[in-house]
Amino acid sequence: VLEGLSALGKDDPELASVVLDAVRREGVTIREGAMVQRVSGTAGAIKVEIKTEAGSETIEGTHLLMAVGRKPNLEGLGLEKAGIDYEKSGIKVDAGLTTSNRKVYAIGDCIGGLQFTHVANYHAGIVIRRALFRIPAKVDTGVIPWVTYTEPEMAHVGLTEAAARDKYSKVNVLRWPMHENDRAQAQLTTEGLVKVVVDKRGRILGASIVGENAGELIQMWSLAISQKMKIKVMMNWISPYPTLSEVNKRVAYRQYATAASNTAVRKVIGWLAKLG
């Protein structure tokens, strides 16, 4: 039961649907956009009354797991005395992770935002560079990847297709299915796809992967986006065969397959062919 939310709502709907279909095939029923009205019962016999657009419903079960999220525990720290501003979601910081007290930094979950261990590690690296070496490092949330450890896994970095279309006038969306990969076929993990969004100049804006080892496969795209690489770079490396990582190279080639379908490009190719 998702109270007022949709399942995997922050992820690309195209990829999220792959995960949700797999979950449903295992017998899990998902109620989205629901409001919990009442919880009752005894140990081993629990009732949850919910309300959705379709009406009211009572769900019965033996156990109740509550995933209510978390928020920073800032009470009793004396932040006001230290001149450190904060709000309900966390301590306020600038792009350099400096608080309103310029001598104090804050990192990780206590500042809200993306609450991942690897984000806290990333923050720590920025603070060390700023505090010890006076390097003006700043947080770039656009290069932070995340992984949803479902089966199959889902991973993402950068802009989603929807976000990219909102920000840029023209984008190209590249896809490559896992079932075209020989390693995936050999180990019977063919479910999923790679999806990459590039701008009109070929700069990589975002990447999403759903499938076996998606969390490992996304790391190349995280590097590419952080270094502002273009999609052609992803074609110029050699991937060992047979590995799942070949999908990252194959999806990059879709950029030029798409270009070849353009009428003007086809005319140029035909003209060059006549020249021999």
Where are these regions (language model features)?
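General small-molecule cofactor/ligand-binding pocket signal
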Residues: T29-R31, Y105, N172-L174
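FAD-site-proximal beta/loop scaffold in flavoenzymes
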Residues: T58-F133, M220, M235
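Flexible, acidic loop-helix segments that line cofactor/substrate-binding pockets
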Residues: G9, G33, V39, A137-E153
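Glycine/Thr-rich phosphate-binding loops of Rossmann-like dinucleotide-binding domains
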Residues: G9, N73-G76, L114, D182-A184, ...
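Flexible, glycine-rich terminal cap/loop adjacent to redox cofactors
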Residues: L132, A137, Y149-T160, R165-G276
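Short beta-strand and adjoining strand-loop segment in the mid-core
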Residues: K51, D109-F116, V147-M154
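A Rossmann-like FAD-binding core segment of flavoenzymes
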Residues: V1-A95, D166
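A short, glycine/Asx- and small/polar-enriched loop/turn
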Residues: G41-I46, N101, Q187-G192
